[in-house]
């Protein structure tokens, strides 16, 4: 079979104006970036707000292998299949970060015959949103350092500045840096560091803001650090929220592209799910719900991270809650969670599938806690065997969860028809009754304990001394009624990436709590989660090139 990039380059794209015409979007509603990419105008976004709200399908997954389990591929393929069976469907997914594209992933726009196009543009600079977020973030850093240099009227303690610079790359050498060196003319020396752009609070804000005014309000609420008297300093104190919003005025508008089969797709925003809330923008998802009968969206990593955050953080900002959750499972991930070594995942091992099913079962149970019906999608790989598939179907039947094999990577829309029909049937026969996991009025500790004990199935939460001090500060400042965004490894229910399967009765340690008032949540950091990833021994970048005619090579 052809590579992803070869498949993408073999497709004759339709002008984006033609793709979105069926949604009632005209040329005048678009801000074009060439023939095949566009942003949707705010006038059109506001015009469709009175339209009925369609059905929402959330795609999540079991705890993944390092290569991922094909959530984006399944999301795209399911939407194509829904359109194929006559359901007016849109996609709302995240934009890839260039760091992982150059690092381990090599691309993140779906795969095989379930891709959003033009995949080269989407994986690289796209419409410049990542650049705008990076620039806004670093403009704030420059303004903070300038304030220190110009006399520090606000009394900011440079030892307690929370705000870091960002770059959209995996670059471990930038995790800890010192700025302001070189004498009095070059600023005030202080410790600083870089995060990856998608970890920036501005990325989370962009994905939760509903319009320019809300964007400015959220930007003003960002806590950049503390004064010498330990009181918080915000962007509003610096009076620069207007300037930051100006940099982001186009980035906030959702991007429109198409799939191989011509399904319209919003690709907008891209926070990571292990260090942020892991969902595409509220604006894109909400607008899709007003334009289509079915919207298919995704949340990053496993359901313990992305789906929990989608349901506890993003859903309260949407006009509706998910009508169904599709949990993507692969036999290789089940075998890994069943104790098989990574180099043996392609070998038949029915017993390991049975052992690893405990992981999938827990995710199904967790989704049901939110009052939403679950459907299991087996993302088919060439190494899967009939015996393994039969065992998984039998196990799913034992817990009364619908399950379908999906071959959208190899077969495109046709390979997702059975899944699409099952999802539509599930929505019709099992109406969702959404409820949040916790009430925001609970204490910070109680909310974290609720997530750890009910979703992860841990027995106890330990708070390090630094975290205890920060909780007291959060309560003192009146921030304790915000939801919790857990920063945790994606590979395990616990904070130990090696504890695979369905561990129980473990303890989780909270080492730090970071207020993200602009985004509207408190980040609870566990384990060794990094906000600036590093590159692997052999980065995907080594396989990439561009020919003299501009043809891109090596994205996959």
Curated annotation (Swiss-Prot):
InterPro entries: Formate_THF_ligase, Formate_THF_ligase_CS, P-loop_NTPase. One of its GO terms (biological process) is tetrahydrofolate interconversion. GO terms for molecular function: ATP binding; formate-tetrahydrofolate ligase activity. It is an enzyme of class 6 (ligase). Keywords: ATP-binding, Ligase, Nucleotide-binding, One-carbon metabolism. Pfam families: FTHFS. Disulfide bonds: none annotated. CDD domains: FTHFS. Its EC number is 6.3.4.3. Gene3D superfamilies: Domain 2, N(10)-formyltetrahydrofolate synthetase (3.30.1510.10), Formyltetrahydrofolate synthetase, domain 3 (3.10.410.10), P-loop containing nucleotide triphosphate hydrolases (3.40.50.300). PROSITE patterns: FTHFS_1, FTHFS_2. ATP binds at residues 65-72. Pathway: One-carbon metabolism; tetrahydrofolate interconversion. It catalyses: (6S)-5,6,7,8-tetrahydrofolate + formate + ATP = (6R)-10-formyltetrahydrofolate + ADP + phosphate. SUPFAM superfamilies: P-loop containing nucleoside triphosphate hydrolases. Belongs to the formate--tetrahydrofolate ligase family. HAMAP family: FTHFS. This is Formate--tetrahydrofolate ligase.
């Amino acid at each position: 079979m052809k590579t992803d990039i070869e498949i993408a380059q073999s497709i004759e794209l339709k002008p984006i104006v033609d793709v979105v015409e069926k949604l009632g979007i005209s040329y005048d509603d678009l801000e074009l970036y060439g023939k095949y990419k566009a942003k949707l105008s705010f006038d059109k976004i506001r015009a469709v707000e009175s339209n009925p709200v369609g059905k929402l399908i959330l795609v999540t997954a079991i705890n993944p292998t390092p290569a991922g389990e094909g959530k984006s591929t399944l999301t795209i393929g399911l939407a194509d299949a829904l359109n194929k069976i006559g359901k007016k469907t849109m996609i709302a997914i995240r934009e890839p970060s260039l760091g992982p594209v150059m690092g381990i992933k090599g691309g993140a726009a779906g795969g095989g015959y379930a891709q959003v196009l033009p995949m080269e543009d989407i994986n690289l600079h796209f419409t410049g949103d990542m650049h705008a977020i990076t620039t806004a973030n670093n403009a704030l850093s420059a303004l903070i350092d300038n304030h220190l240099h110009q006399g520090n009227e606000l009394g900011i303690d440079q030892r307690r500045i929370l705000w870091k610079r960002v770059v959209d790359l995996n670059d471990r050498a930038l995790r800890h840096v010192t700025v302001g060196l070189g004498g009095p003319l070059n600023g005030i020396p202080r410790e600083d560091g870089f995060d990856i752009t998608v970890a920036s609070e501005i990325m989370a804000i962009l994905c939760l803001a509903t319009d320019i005014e809300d964007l400015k309000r959220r930007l003003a609420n960002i806590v950049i650090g503390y004064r010498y008297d330990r009181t918080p300093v915000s962007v509003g104190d610096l009076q620069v929220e207007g300037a930051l919003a100006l940099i982001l005025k186009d980035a906030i508008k959702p991007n429109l592209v198409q799939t191989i089969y011509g399904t319209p797709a919003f690709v907008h925003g891209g926070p990571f799910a292990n260090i942020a809330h892991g969902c595409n923008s509220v604006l894109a998802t909400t607008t899709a719900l007003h334009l289509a009968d079915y919207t298919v969206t995704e949340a990053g990593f496993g359901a313990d991270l992305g789906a929990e955050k989608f349901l506890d953080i993003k859903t309260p900002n949407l006009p509706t809650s998910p009508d169904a959750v599709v949990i993507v499972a692969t036999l290789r991930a089940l075998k890994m969670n069943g104790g098989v070594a990574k180099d043996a995942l392609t070998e038949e091992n029915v017993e390991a599938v049975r052992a690893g099913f405990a992981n999938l079962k827990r995710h199904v149970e967790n989704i049901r806690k939110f009052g939403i019906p679950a459907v299991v999608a087996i993302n088919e790989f060439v190494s899967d065997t009939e015996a393994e598939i039969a065992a998984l179907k039998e196990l799913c039947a034992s817990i009364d969860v619908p399950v379908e094999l999906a071959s959208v990577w190899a077969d495109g829309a046709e390979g997702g028809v059975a899944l699409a029909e099952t999802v539509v049937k599930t929505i019709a026969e099992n109406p969702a009754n959404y409820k949040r996991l916790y009430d925001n009025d609970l204490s910070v500790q109680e909310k974290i304990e609720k997530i750890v004990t009910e979703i992860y199935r841990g027995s106890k939460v330990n708070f390090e001394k630094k975290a205890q001090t920060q909780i007291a500060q959060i309560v003192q400042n009146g921030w304790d009624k915000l939801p919790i965004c857990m920063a945790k490894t994606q590979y395990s229910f616990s904070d130990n990436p090696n504890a695979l399967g369905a561990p129980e009765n473990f303890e989780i340690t909270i080492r730090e709590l970071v207020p993200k008032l602009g985004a509207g949540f408190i980040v609870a950091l566990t384990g060794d989660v990094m906000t600036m990833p590093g590159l692997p021994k052999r980065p995907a970048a080594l396989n990439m090139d561009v020919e003299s005619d501009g043809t891109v090579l090596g994205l996959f």
